[in-house]
């Protein structure tokens, strides 16, 4: 088939370039607290803006994605969303995971103080373990697929 004809068919069928965009969404399932955390991994900030607007907060702006990561807190009980362009820097991942931890705990009505510090620690531990377990599986699957 002629590539020009294929391109024309795609354009006329309303095919968006978004289907060709590489991104990954993982869900860190709630454990003690019944609130999942979504993690959107993509360098495509236009896609990230669209995803967060559709799934959590219609007021986000492109400038909200100017950093090395961002966390958008729960609204009306919807899952908070962490955006990361990559998962390469553990310090940035952990930075965003602490924001998500604080958000989950606020959603649950638990204020950080000396008597709740351990609960915050357990939630952070849970989210971190969930994140790295899923990232490890994704990387293993990608490696297996390339073989």
Task: Give the residues covered by each predicted segment.
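Sec-dependent signal peptide recognition
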Residues: 1-8
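A short, structured loop/turn motif at beta-sheet edges
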Residues: 93-95
């Amino acid at each position: 088939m002629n590539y020009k004809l294929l391109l024309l068919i795609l354009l006329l069928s309303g095919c968006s370039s978004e289907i060709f965009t590489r991104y990954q969404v993982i869900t860190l399932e709630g454990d003690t607290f019944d609130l999942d955390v979504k993690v959107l991994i993509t360098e495509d900030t236009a896609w990230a803006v669209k995803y967060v607007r559709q799934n959590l907060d219609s007021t986000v702006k492109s400038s909200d994605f100017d950093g090395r990561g961002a966390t958008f807190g729960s609204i009306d009980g919807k899952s908070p969303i962490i955006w990361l362009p990559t998962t390469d820097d553990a310090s940035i991942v952990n930075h965003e995971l602490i924001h998500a931890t604080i958000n989950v705990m606020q959603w649950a009505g638990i204020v950080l103080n000396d008597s709740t510090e351990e609960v915050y620690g357990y939630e952070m531990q849970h989210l971190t373990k969930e994140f790295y377990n899923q990232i490890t599986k994704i990387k293993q699957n990608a490696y297996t697929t390339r073989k």
